[in-house]
């Protein structure tokens, strides 16, 4: 947590995004963008660790600054408001902000598309489905009552349909389909989803983490992020784990979600391969992404809390990945740069942007996972 204090002093009133591996200097944003919640989440984790009221006040003040994003048109509100407020525990203001964001997301849910659209707040096309628009959104929506839980389930399943391809449909888990003209209506946990347009041919050979929608042609795969984006798989695994921990979301589709988890674990050898994956699996000698590893480790620890035959191996692997990150990729004390930096995170391999840097969300998930190992946080609630 010393690194959090150093970062706080360095960024002033701005939100940290990524830090240079040579000197630890942060690139920052004024309003937080999609990563703002990870900074406030880190501050809440520090407050839990220190049990210092001054640290709680600091975390609360930064969290309040997320409020303008509550009604913003972006599915990344799941990342912003779940991870930015859930570590706050019983803090009433953080809970109220989370509930406000959940209601706004539910209002923005599109029942025709069966998801909360990616949105236009960050620029670019609005009608996208992206793997990073699912984590956080599932538990956030689930907190908005039965309608929210149904929307969370539909949002997740639509992304699994698209991002995992046909293999992602293994183990339908009680989903009923009925043809209604050119529309395919699916029931998930008592809620209807309608696939409008559908695919225009077979799914691509390699599942894509991002899709765009057009009323004339339906869902079409995007080339960016690339199909081998390891963080995309990590985000999906995290969302599936959160759904499996929430019966109101998993409902009768638990078998399908379990199959999706199995597919995601197998695709990149998560349980037995490299602890830190390449940022793009099609470039095995390219940049690593420790943030993908940290996200995956937390997802594994969550899956370990789901009763079943893989719980023990997920627990062991999640802990092993966290220990590897802490031992091999975190800076120690010495001249030139701060201690406690989780290096070798890759912001955007395709653009060559911040490819071996400290990333604020990598820091958050490493801290969250390590806190869970010492029972400092309940991963079924964060």
Task: Please annotate each region the language model reported.
Residues 1-382:
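Glycan-recognition and catalytic cores of secretory/periplasmic carbohydrate-active enzymes
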């Amino acid at each position: 947590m010393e690194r959090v204090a150093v970062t706080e002093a360095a960024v002033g009133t701005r939100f940290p995004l990524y830090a240079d591996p040579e000197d630890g200097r942060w690139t920052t944003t004024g309003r937080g963008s999609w990563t703002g919640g990870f900074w406030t989440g880190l501050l809440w984790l520090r407050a839990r660790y220190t049990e210092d009221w001054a640290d709680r006040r600091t975390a609360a003040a930064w969290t309040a600054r997320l409020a303008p994003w509550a009604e913003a048109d972006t599915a990344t509100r799941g990342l912003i408001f779940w991870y930015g407020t859930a570590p706050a525990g019983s803090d009433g203001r953080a809970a109220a902000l989370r509930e406000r964001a959940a209601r706004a997301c539910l209002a923005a849910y599109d029942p025709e598309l069966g998801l909360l659209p990616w949105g236009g707040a960050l620029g670019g096309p609005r009608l996208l489905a992206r793997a990073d628009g699912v984590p956080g959104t599932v538990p956030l929506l689930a907190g908005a009552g039965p309608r929210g839980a149904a929307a969370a389930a539909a949002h997740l399943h639509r992304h699994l349909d698209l991002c995992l391809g046909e293999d992602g449909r293994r183990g339908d888990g009680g989903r009923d389909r009925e043809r209604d003209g050119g529309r395919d209506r699916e029931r998930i946990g008592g809620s209807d989803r309608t696939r409008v347009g559908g695919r225009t041919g077979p799914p691509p050979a390699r599942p894509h983490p991002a899709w765009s929608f057009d009323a004339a042609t339906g869902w079409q795969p995007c080339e960016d992020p690339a199909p081998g984006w390891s963080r995309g798989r990590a985000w999906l695994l995290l969302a599936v784990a959160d759904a499996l921990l929430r019966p109101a979301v998993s409902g009768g589709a638990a078998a399908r979600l379990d199959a999706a988890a199995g597919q995601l674990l197998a695709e990149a050898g998560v349980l037995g391969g490299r602890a830190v994956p390449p940022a793009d699996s099609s470039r095995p000698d390219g940049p690593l992404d420790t943030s993908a590893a940290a996200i995956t480790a937390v997802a594994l620890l969550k899956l370990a809390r789901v009763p079943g035959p893989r719980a023990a191996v997920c627990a062991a692997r999640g802990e092993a990945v966290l220990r590897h990150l802490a031992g091999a990729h975190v800076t120690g004390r010495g001249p030139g740069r701060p201690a406690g930096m989780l290096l070798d995170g890759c912001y955007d391999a395709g653009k060559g942007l911040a490819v071996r840097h400290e990333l604020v969300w990598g820091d958050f998930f490493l801290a969250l996972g390590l806190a869970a190992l010492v029972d400092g946080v309940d991963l079924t609630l964060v």
